[in-house]
């Protein structure tokens, strides 16, 4: 039985994935439309440049279409697709390595020997040597994300930008919810430390 576009729009992701598994390009197109924004968030925040993000976005959906027949039954389509998106974006980052690596570790809260919080110091200079205060906050945060290790960055993107539940973020990154919670908290502390010094 053929379904029209309106009927397809009303179907669940899993039902659409089942139809796509049998070769329905129309069902897959609905899934692309439905999840393009989230996959774009993953690609844009995991890749260093817009060009890399666009390549990762395209490759994610090409890979998903190519592999949809192997989509594991009983698995959430969203989890499966976002895992492909994250793997694709991380692979893109690996290909584009060669950029200097910086760390936001200095922006984590510091404590003295007695366990008291130590006040942060001064202003931070970004990677180009300009004062961060002169940059747009979005640019500062994007640069800051570039300085965070890939696994912590991935956890942060899934939890705080896509607002996925801990269990789903853990399934996408194939790790425990506890690790996701810890990594996300660590990134929040680093970003807060950075922003507090602006």
Where are these regions (language model features)?
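Acidic, proline/glycine-rich intrinsically disordered inter-domain spacer in sigma factors
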Residues: 2-6, 110-146
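Short, charged helix-capping/linker segments at alpha-helix termini
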Residues: 2-6, 21-30, 40-59, 177
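Sigma70-family region 2
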Residues: 21-22, 48-49, 59-76, 94-97
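Amphipathic, Lys/Arg- and hydrophobic-enriched alpha-helical face
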Residues: 32-50, 67, 145, 190, ...
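Structural recognition of an alpha-helix C-terminal capping motif at a helix-to-coil junction
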Residues: 55-62, 75-87
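Arg/Lys-rich amphipathic alpha helix in sigma70-family domain 2
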Residues: 69-73, 83-104, 113, 134, ...
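Short, Lys/Arg-enriched C-terminal cap helix and immediately downstream tail that follows
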Residues: 94-97, 148, 153, 188-198
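Helix-turn-helix DNA-binding module
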Residues: 142-146, 150-154, 162-179
């Amino acid at each position: 039985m053929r379904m029209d576009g309106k009927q397809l729009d009303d179907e669940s992701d899993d039902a659409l994935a089942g139809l796509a598994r049998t070769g329905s390009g129309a069902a897959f197109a609905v899934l692309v439309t439905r999840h393009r924004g989230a996959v774009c968030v993953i690609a844009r925040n995991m890749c260093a440049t817009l060009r890399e993000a666009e390549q990762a976005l395209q490759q994610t959906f090409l890979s998903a279409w190519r592999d949809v027949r192997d989509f594991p039954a009983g698995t959430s389509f969203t989890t499966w697709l976002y895992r492909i998106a994250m793997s694709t974006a991380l692979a893109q980052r690996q290909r584009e390595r060669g950029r200097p690596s910086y760390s936001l570790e200095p922006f984590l809260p510091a404590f003295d020997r007695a366990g008291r919080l130590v006040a942060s110091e001064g202003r931070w200079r970004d990677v180009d040597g300009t004062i961060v205060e002169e940059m747009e906050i979005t640019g500062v945060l994007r640069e800051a994300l570039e300085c965070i290790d890939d696994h912590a960055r991935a956890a942060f993107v899934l939890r705080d930008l896509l607002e996925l539940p801990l269990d789903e973020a853990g399934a996408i990154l194939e790790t425990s919810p506890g690790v996701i919670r810890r990594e996300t908290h660590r990134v929040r502390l680093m970003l807060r430390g950075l922003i507090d010094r602006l």
